[in-house]
């Protein structure tokens, strides 16, 4: 089995986690108490969904997940929510005091106290796996817990489970919408850790998600529930190939192999189609070609950056539902002829496709329409550097005046860490620039060598 353990850190991680597990349960027909009426064989360990759920002797399905927060309110919502019976009580770990939007508190003072307990729980989950494939980490980079404790956990996971892949789903700060003044600090510090300790990071930002909700679903004032359900659809599409058997299945490690050309360049842009309300879907024929076109629309991106300003290095298309390879090939061929979608010149083909025959599921009473087929795109594009440089710029403005720095230093952090993290991100911006640069001048140099021999 290729089990995956999900780790949900801080408010953002836990709330997106709730939406994801709600959707997984609906997709697999698992009830909120963990029972699965359709599954007659108790202890049948070969079912594909066992990558995400473990089955107890009593036939109860328990998510392979850990919820961690440094303060209890969000965890208590899980403990009292609809799915309270789904989780093992030990899988939900909460501290007493908050990280207060401070990376240093999440990483050094308060996070330190809880991290061993969390790793112990993760170890228990890992021991239950026959072939652990990796970790999915859900967090926000702008808060205190998601950034600080998130980085600390990733560092420790690298030590304990070096070879296992770690994918992170990070809610990154948006250009206009901010929940904290110190977001740029937390974000730069945690991105510094993500660079080193994750194999692949999927960037999502709230502003882009708000826009998608407003534009495509006509929700005037989207709530976090609306956003999280959207995120859950994306994550469900990415993980569908692990949880169902399909025609062209894509493994977690396969993502990395196909999307990450250089270890540092692993920040992904995602989009999903069709994002459409029930009233509209009734009147539209959403063919494979149409949904494939719409995932490349800049307006549908889940991160605020414009892919037309960058070049694609690699692109994964995960289809689900009523889709056949022939249609996919035709749709991709059409995309390739479009001049708007530019690939770097050293990566001519650049598309990886996966098909899963399980149709997309929607939450009853949710915003999305039930459709026959859907596609999720994950792209590695140089345009994501836009989002990085935006955060860096905000960081520079505050750091030049050393504003708010005393809160971090007071929690036992050294000022040097700020500049170290910032330099690392400056190097990353440079890396993206070089990757997207034309390689034409390189050809001239090779010819010179030819004359020497």
UniProtKB/Swiss-Prot annotation:
Dimer of alpha and beta chains. A typical microtubule is a hollow water-filled tube with an outer diameter of 25 nm and an inner diameter of 15 nM. Alpha-beta heterodimers associate head-to-tail to form protofilaments running lengthwise along the microtubule wall with the beta-tubulin subunit facing the microtubule plus end conferring a structural polarity. Microtubules usually have 13 protofilaments but different protofilament numbers can be found in some organisms and specialized cells. It comes from Pelvetia fastigiata (Brown alga). InterPro entries: Alpha_tubulin, Tub_FtsZ_C, Tubulin, Tubulin/FtsZ-like_C, Tubulin/FtsZ_2-layer-sand-dom, Tubulin/FtsZ_GTPase_sf, Tubulin_C, Tubulin_CS. SMART domains: Tubulin, Tubulin_C. GO terms for cellular component: cytoplasm; microtubule. Gene3D superfamilies: Helix hairpin bin, Tubulin/FtsZ, C-terminal domain, Tubulin/FtsZ, GTPase domain. The lineage of its organism: Eukaryota, Sar, Stramenopiles, Ochrophyta, PX clade. Tubulin is the major constituent of microtubules, a cylinder consisting of laterally associated linear protofilaments composed of alpha- and beta-tubulin heterodimers. Microtubules grow by the addition of GTP-tubulin dimers to the microtubule end, where a stabilizing cap forms. Below the cap, tubulin dimers are in GDP-bound state, owing to GTPase activity of alpha-tubulin. Belongs to the tubulin family. The active site is at residue 254. The gene is TUBA2. One of its GO terms (biological process) is microtubule-based process. Mg(2+) binds at residue 71. It is found in: Cytoplasm, Cytoskeleton. GTP binds at residues 11, 71, 144-145, 179, 206, 228. It catalyses: GTP + H2O = GDP + phosphate + H(+). Residues 432-453 are annotated as: Disordered. The modification N6-acetyllysine is found at residue 40. One of its GO terms (molecular function) is metal ion binding. Its cofactor is Mg(2+). This is Tubulin alpha-2 chain. Its EC number is 3.6.5.-. Keywords: Acetylation, Cytoplasm, Cytoskeleton, GTP-binding, Hydrolase, Magnesium, Metal-binding, Microtubule, Nucleotide-binding. It comes from the Eukaryota. Undergoes a tyrosination/detyrosination cycle, the cyclic removal and re-addition of a C-terminal tyrosine residue by the enzymes tubulin tyrosine carboxypeptidase (TTCP) and tubulin tyrosine ligase (TTL), respectively. Acetylation of alpha chains at Lys-40 stabilizes microtubules and affects affinity and processivity of microtubule motors. This modification has a role in multiple cellular functions, ranging from cell motility, cell cycle progression or cell differentiation to intracellular trafficking and signaling.
């Amino acid at each position: 089995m290729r089990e995956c353990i999900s780790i949900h850190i801080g408010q953002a991680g836990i709330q997106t986690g709730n939406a994801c597990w709600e959707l997984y349960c609906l997709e697999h027909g698992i009830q909120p108490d963990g029972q699965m009426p359709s599954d007659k064989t108790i202890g049948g360990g070969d079912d594909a969904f066992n990558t995400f759920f473990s089955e107890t002797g009593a036939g109860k399905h328990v998510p392979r997940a850990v919820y961690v927060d440094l303060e209890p309110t969000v965890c208590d919502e899980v403990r009292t929510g609809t799915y309270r019976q789904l989780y093992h009580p030990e899988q939900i770990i909460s501290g007493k005091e908050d990280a207060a939007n401070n990376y240093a508190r999440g990483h050094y003072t308060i996070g330190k106290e809880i991290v061993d307990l969390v790793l112990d729980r993760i170890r228990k989950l890992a021991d239950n796996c026959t072939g652990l494939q990796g970790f999915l980490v859900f967090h926000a980079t702008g808060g205190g817990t998601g950034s600080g404790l998130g980085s600390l956990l990733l560092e420790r996971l690298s030590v304990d489970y070096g070879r296992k892949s770690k994918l992170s789903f990070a809610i990154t700060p948006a250009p206009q919408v901010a929940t904290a003044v110190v977001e740029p600090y937390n974000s730069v510090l945690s991105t510094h850790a993500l660079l080193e300790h994750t194999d692949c990071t999927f960037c999502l930002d709230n502003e882009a998600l708000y826009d998608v909700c407003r534009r495509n679903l006509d929700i005037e004032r989207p709530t976090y529930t609306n956003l999280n359900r959207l995120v859950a659809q994306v994550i469900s599409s990415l993980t569908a190939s692990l949880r169902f058997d399909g025609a062209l299945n894509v493994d977690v490690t396969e993502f990395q192999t196909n999307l990450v050309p250089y270890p540092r360049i692993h920040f992904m842009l995602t989009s999903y189609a069709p994002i459409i309300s029930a009233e509209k879907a009734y009147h539209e024929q959403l063919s494979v070609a149409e949904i494939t076109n719409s995932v490349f629309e800049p307006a549908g991106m889940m991160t605020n950056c414009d892919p037309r300003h960058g070049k694609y290095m690699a692109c994964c298309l995960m289809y689900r539902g009523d889709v056949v390879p022939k249609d996919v090939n035709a749709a991709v061929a059409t995309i390739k002829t479009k001049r708007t979608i530019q690939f770097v010149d050293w990566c001519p083909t650049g598309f990886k496709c996966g098909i899963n025959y399980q149709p997309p599921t929607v939450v009853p009473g949710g915003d999305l329409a039930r459709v026959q087929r859907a596609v999720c795109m994950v792209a590695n594009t140089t345009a994501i550097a836009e989002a990085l440089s935006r955060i860096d710029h905000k960081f520079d403005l505050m750091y030049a005046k050393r504003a708010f720095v005393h809160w971090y230093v007071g929690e036992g952090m050294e000022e040097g860490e700020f500049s170290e993290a910032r330099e690392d991100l400056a190097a990353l911006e440079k890396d993206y620039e070089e990757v997207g640069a034309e390689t034409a001048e390189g050809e001239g140099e090779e010819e010179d060598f030819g004359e020497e021999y």
